[in-house]
Amino acid sequence: MAERTFSIIKPDAVERNLSGAILKMIQDSGLKVVAMKMIHLTRSQAEGFYAVHRERPFFDSLVTYMCSGPVVCSVLEGDNAIQRYRDLMGATNPANAAEGTIRKTYAVSIEANSVHGSDAPETAAYEIAYFFNALEMVG
């Protein structure tokens, strides 16, 4: 059954002109891009998006990093899209990521790990709605 998930290509990857290469990996995996936009998050937008981490010690540095440059947000669709994209991203810490994953290939650190992806259907729905309305999605 087709499912949707949310993806962010983070500032470190956008700055290094890796958006196209990462999108190619996503599409080559069989996932379909049904919505996409490039934005520069404000501090308020980043704080809202990562509100679930507000009490974590890394919250401030995460928000600062996510506001440091443009990001590419997209909605991906396909069978079992959430798990498939998480597998393609690789472990949060690129040192632990499997060969051939986005993070093993492109990430520079645990924070500047190039991509974000939803971890469950509930978070995918929240994250998609945070950045996109229904009119911005195709397919």
From Swiss-Prot:
Active site: H116 (pros-phosphohistidine intermediate)
Keyword terms, alphabetized: ATP-binding, Cytoplasm, Kinase, Magnesium, Metal-binding, Nucleotide metabolism, Nucleotide-binding, Phosphoprotein, Transferase
Keyword RNA-binding: no
Binding residues annotated for ATP, in chain numbering: K10, F58, R86, T92, R103, N113
Gene Ontology annotations of biological process type: CTP biosynthetic process; GTP biosynthetic process; UTP biosynthetic process
Reactions mediated catalytically: a 2'-deoxyribonucleoside 5'-diphosphate + ATP = a 2'-deoxyribonucleoside 5'-triphosphate + ADP; a ribonucleoside 5'-diphosphate + ATP = a ribonucleoside 5'-triphosphate + ADP
Name of this chain's protein: Nucleoside diphosphate kinase
